[in-house]
Amino acid sequence: MAKEYSRTQRIGDQMQRELAELIRREVKDPRVGLVTITAVDVSRDLGHAKVFITVMGQDGTDAVPQTLKALTSAASFLRLHLGRVMQLRSVPQLHFHFDESVSRGVHLSALIERAVAEDRLHQDAGEPDTKE
């Protein structure tokens, strides 16, 4: 049985691909660095779209707020081009949000690796050396 795949999901997926290409190719703002679009959630009435992004090299800088500000200012430009490429009667308003799930995932992976390493240290320290 085929999995239900709604129109808003299809539009969101296509918007994700098209926005990634448009940002890479057309947006010339120096505040926009290496941006990855992780997801696009489109409302049921196609009036609004939440665009979730990550920014490479954001450690210790204000790159994320600057990138969000630049993308928000370029939103009308991006909507215009999306309308041409996707041939939609009404292009959703774009709302950009930072996707913290990637950084949270990296943090959790580091915690797990540290716990496993500590566990191995305790196991190695508790076992007598049987090799001769």
UniProtKB/Swiss-Prot annotation:
A Gene Ontology term for the protein's cellular component: cytosol
Pfam families: RBFA (PF02033)
Keywords for this protein: Cytoplasm, Ribosome biogenesis
Subcellular location: Cytoplasm
Top-level division of the source organism's lineage: Bacteria
Described purpose of this protein according to its UniProt entry: One of several proteins that assist in the late maturation steps of the functional core of the 30S ribosomal subunit. Associates with free 30S ribosomal subunits (but not with 30S subunits that are part of 70S ribosomes or polysomes). Required for efficient processing of 16S rRNA. May interact with the 5'-terminal helix region of 16S rRNA.
Subunit structure: Monomer. Binds 30S ribosomal subunits, but not 50S ribosomal subunits or 70S ribosomes.
NCBIfam families xref list: rbfA (TIGR00082)
Protein name: Ribosome-binding factor A
The organism of origin for this protein: Pseudomonas entomophila (strain L48)
Recorded name of the encoding gene: rbfA
